[in-house]
Amino acid sequence: MGVKAAQTGIWASQGQSIRVVGFQAQTAHRAICLLGFVVLVLLQCCSAYKLVCYYTSWSQYREGDGSCFPDAIDRFLCTHIIYSFANISNDHIDTWEWNDVTLYGMLNTLKNRNPNLKTLLSVGGWNFGSQRFSNIASNTQSRRTFIKSVPPFLRTHGFDGLDLAWLYPGQRDKQHFTTLIKEMRAEFIKEAQPGKKQLLLSAAVSAGKVTIDSSYDIAKISQHLDFISIMTYDFHGAWRGTTGHHSPLFRGQEDASPDRFSNTDYAVGYMLRLEAPASKLVMGIPTFGRSFTLASSETGVGAPISGPGIPGRFTKEAGTLAYYEICDFLRGATVHRILGQQVPYATKGNQWVGYDDQESVKSKVQYLKERQLAGAMVWALDLDDFQGSFCGQDLRFPLTNAIKDALAAT
């Protein structure tokens, strides 16, 4: 009976005493948990910087440990999470994957315990193509139909805004892209008038000078966007015929035109010169690397290649490795740092991969702070070590966490 009293706290005076103590302990525990939750929320919401993180729906199809669903995401890791991608069907925003609605729910459930988290839905992407966007944006009725379809779709599925991923507007689309953004913003303002919180509007833009010049009126689109994610990666690929880092912070000593434009520093500076407000510019940091197959015994930057690198075990795309695949590659590899560009690369056999690590992302965050930018963008959460089982640190999302910590550092 004494044991039962101790367990239930309702029979004997001794049991009642135990019940009170248990209640006090539970109350204290809950208070500590609540305090920890409040601290995490305050740390996130009160940071001066955005950490905008993309999640790709097709990552669910990767085999085994490479498969990633939205419920694997740390709800306190990013300030904004962008779901990629939505489709456009008959001039209306629409789902792309067969289970998008389920995944939308998984993602937006993260906000239940972090009300400061913002989620956006990105429309477009590489597979969508530029021509379909062009057809919609250039036709007044199609554009209007698309714009009107967006707010109810976002509200229905619990998103806080829209991200435009038109890759890329052509020269003739430049004005149409500006008009699309301006009219979308006007619709968001109008839709919010009944007392709803206004939907956010962002865009992902190229970091290449030629594309920037032909595709965007930066000064005008900046007026109507909450933030602009500049994709400061993929500066270098197998099409160059030589090795090179795809996301260098600075120009390399050996770089000549057009390579002198192919770095983060130039792209950011150029955007600022084109009147993109620093307070709206979010700088891209990749959680993937670009790999090459060497054509000779040369292994340095600028070495000849025979083509892209061997596909990764999970991503299965020649020339691309997720950070967690790179961690596997580094076992037995030789690591080098390109000091002037402040990024690493690694070689093993005839394989060469340029990537970002925790040291290089910290350098990039320090740079964006010095430029007084709005924050960092990550492509993509599912390419980081999201399980914490590949990179030997017992830490989930090591690159994204390094970015977050660097943003929070004083």
From Swiss-Prot:
Its main location: secreted. GO terms for molecular function: carbohydrate binding; chitin binding. Glycans are attached at N87. Belongs to the glycosyl hydrolase 18 family. It is found in: Secreted, Extracellular space; Cytoplasm; Cytoplasm, Perinuclear region; Endoplasmic reticulum. Residues 49-410 form the GH18 domain. GO terms for cellular component: cytoplasm; endoplasmic reticulum; extracellular space; perinuclear region of cytoplasm. InterPro entries: Chitinase_II/V-like_cat, Chitinase_insertion_sf, Glyco_hydro18_cat, Glycoside_hydrolase_SF, Glycosyl_Hydrlase_18. Residues 1-48 form the signal peptide. The gene is CHI3L1. The keyword Hydrolase does not apply. PANTHER family: CHITINASE, CHITINASE-3-LIKE PROTEIN 1. The keyword Amino-acid biosynthesis does not apply. Keywords: Antimicrobial, Apoptosis, Cytoplasm, Disulfide bond, Endoplasmic reticulum, Glycoprotein, Inflammatory response, Lectin, Secreted, Signal. Disulfide bonds join C53-C78, C327-C391. Residues 351-365 are annotated as: Important for AKT1 activation and IL8 production. Pfam families: Glyco_hydro_18. This is Chitinase-3-like protein 1. Chitin binds at E97, W98, G124, G125, W126, N127, Y168, M231, T232, Y233, D234, R290, W379. It comes from the Eukaryota. Monomer.
